[in-house]
Amino acid sequence: VGSEMCIRDRYQKFKESVFFRRLFFLSFVTSLILFRTLLNRQLWMNPLSDVMGGWGIWETVNGEQKLTTECIENVIMMVPFSAVVMWTFGKKIGNSWKKILWYSGKIAFIFSISIEMLQLLLRLGTFQLSDIFYNTVGGVIGGLMYCAVIKARKYL
């Protein structure tokens, strides 16, 4: 009976509160990122084996150029995250594009550092500085997209 009341209460809150729905969506996006970066990984014996990481879309393997999309994936992964964070907490941050870009970059950087530290401590994947950089870039792009949508909504 107690769990049924709790579920009804949460459902009612979900229907009534826009902020609660946005927070739920942010939790969903965050869980997708954590699944991709932490839960869906193999154990590594030495998580510090490639600290610098890949800084481009081409890497040399055994003298052969190979296309890698890791940097693009890191950028794309953080774009929706930071856009949803800005959408959820936009009223607290304000509409100034400088503030939005600063906060979206800062939040993406802190979230990325947290993921990399967890990968290091749990030995899931490798700690890479390039991941932190590209995730932060993705966060700023997400902030830019949020700014563009906010500006476009004024004219619609």
PLM regions: where:
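Bulky hydrophobic segments
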Residues: 3, 8-124, 129, 140-156
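Hydrophobic alpha-helical segments of small multi-pass membrane proteins
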Residues: 135-136
